[in-house]
Amino acid sequence: EITWRDWSSDVCSSDLGGKGANLAEMTRIGVPVPAGFTITTEACNEYSKTKEFPAGMWDQVVAAMAETEKQTGKKFGDSENPLLVSCRSGAKESMPGMMDTVLNIGLNDVTVASMIKLTNNPRFVYDIYRRLLHMFSSVVLEIADEHFENLLLQYEAEKGYKVDTEMTAEDWKFICDEYKHIVILQYGKEFPQDPVEQIRLATIAVFKSWMGKRAIDYRRAENIPDSLGTAVNICTMVFGNYGDDSATGVAFTRDPIKTWQIGRASCRERV
């Protein structure tokens, strides 16, 4: 595990993966980057061999989370000012959509209540909670997406809603409760309420996704070696669904289609 600020993308993309190395470089040159850290590809390769975290890795993750708390002024799992993070894969070679991501880690029944107090926006909070419940259950607990998708579609149809934006705070709260019930039925246990356990299980899931069939098939097609491994990027959450004045997206500094035609290397000049 290596914090972004200590590294440069010129020398460490094999260790930090493409995302981690670029975040490190952006931090180095002073671009505002949400606080976080990267678990190296070496840790992934070790986990693939032994099915266990490398010795000392988890202690380093705990220390890095403490530093992230210090930088943000928030506390992971805190009932007053909770820190929420994402857990994303990031290999040296881009493999779009082939590996796993979990967002909004750190939410539970306690931190949801504190987030509502902090934001005064219960609709937003229950929306991001249902996203965690669905995504974590699918990626980490390996519960089929259909259980969550079908329930939401049926509920929206019963209410006469055409799009998700018509859902109210009470609607999303109901969906959260139903999603937690699905977890009990399909997984046999309650959804993990401990944020530290959430991030540990999400990290394992990202490591496992490197050797998943979808990722292996993609690497075979693109001639990417299995030995690269994937890094894991733990980053403070930035929300694109907070309200009408928030959004997320991708920005290119040049036309990606025309650039691709003159050489792949030049595609790397992008935001």
Q: How would you name each of these model-derived features?
A:
Residues 218-220, 233-237, 246-252:
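Glycine-rich, charged/polar anion/phosphate-binding loops
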Residues 132, 201, 242-248, 252-270:
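ATP-dependent carboxylate/acyl-activation modules
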Residues 1-12, 265, 269-271:
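Single conserved hydrophobic/aromatic residue that forms the stacking wall/gate
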Residues 9-233, 242:
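N-terminal beta-alpha lobe that positions the nucleotide/phosphoryl donor
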Residues 89-91, 99, 236-238, 256-257, ...:
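A broadly conserved detector of short glycine/acidic/proline-rich loop/turn motifs that flank catalytic sites
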